[in-house]
Design a protein with these regions (language model features):
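Secondary-structure transition motif
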Residues: 1-94
Length: 94
């Protein structure tokens, strides 16, 4: 799947799949009410140029959000510690 975000082309077939364990929430409105929705089939990818991409599905549409490295770290440390430690190093034991 190809997405264009911030004038960069992200081709998920050429990117490394980092995690499928994350959750993504987005805001939508219905009848002037603001609601929070959960994206389905959430995945985080990393490109060879160290760009990060979060993809998710809503109804019958695929969506993507470009992530900074810090945002990717936040998602991974919260939802997929194993992937976090693979890409950013092990955390110190308490």
């Amino acid at each position: 799947m190809i997405f264009v975000t911030n004038s960069l082309k992200y081709d998920t077939t050429k990117m490394e799949l980092v995690s499928t364990k994350c959750e993504y929430k987005y805001i939508g409105t219905i009848l002037n009410m603001t609601l929070r929705y959960s994206g389905k089939n959430v995945k985080i990818f990393k490109s060879s140029k160290n760009h990060w991409l979060l993809t998710y599905e809503i109804d019958y549409k695929n969506c993507a959000v470009a992530l900074s490295e810090e945002e990717a770290k936040e998602y991974l440390i919260h939802y997929d510690l194993e992937a976090y430690e693979k890409y950013f190093g092990e955390l110190e034991e308490a």
